[in-house]
Amino acid sequence: LLHLELHDVCMEKDTVICAVRKDAGDDPDTTNGILVYARVEKCPKSSEITVDGGKGVGRVTRPGLSQKVGEAAINPVPKAMILKAVEDAADRYHYEGGLKVTISVPEGEKIAKKTFNPRLGIQGGISILGTSGIVEPMSEKALIQSIQVEMKQHFSQGEQYLIVTPGNYGADYLREHMDLPFEKNIKCSNYVGETIDMAV
């Protein structure tokens, strides 16, 4: 069981807001140390629990991701974990009405510029990601998965080929010296073999 310190707790009649601070452990994560807020509002006339993104959580603008266009960039696993935690709390207090959960990250829009999100068409903030709720030092795996997500998105839009460059120098050369569509470029870092394998 994970115990986290709560910050900025605010309780009103039908609403409660609190935040936790992300601990990325040994992972070199741009989101390390940021506050992630949850706002939970009672919706007595409903029986549904909903989860959405607020300020600093990105919105999907292109097809090919786990969420539909227009939805908050909250991946299925963390969304399911949030729903389960809220359902458990509602059961504990015998509450049977609806609840609206809004996740927000005040620094999210600024931090998102340092992530893959702009390339994936996620605008306005970061993505809420995860598979277990615990950060593991697996940056290499995370980068390869990010490349795979970007590739899948291109293919879902009907593109038949992609251009792979190791990094910024290759991307700059492509833009300045070759008559090729730059928007089809994917940066693969040192993972050329893995990228080719995923393309096959």
Q: How should these model regions be labeled?
A:
Residues 120-126, 131-200:
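A structural signal for small-residue-enriched, beta-sheet-centric alpha/beta enzyme cores
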Residues 1-120:
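Generic N-terminal targeting/processing segments that precede catalytic cores or assembly contacts
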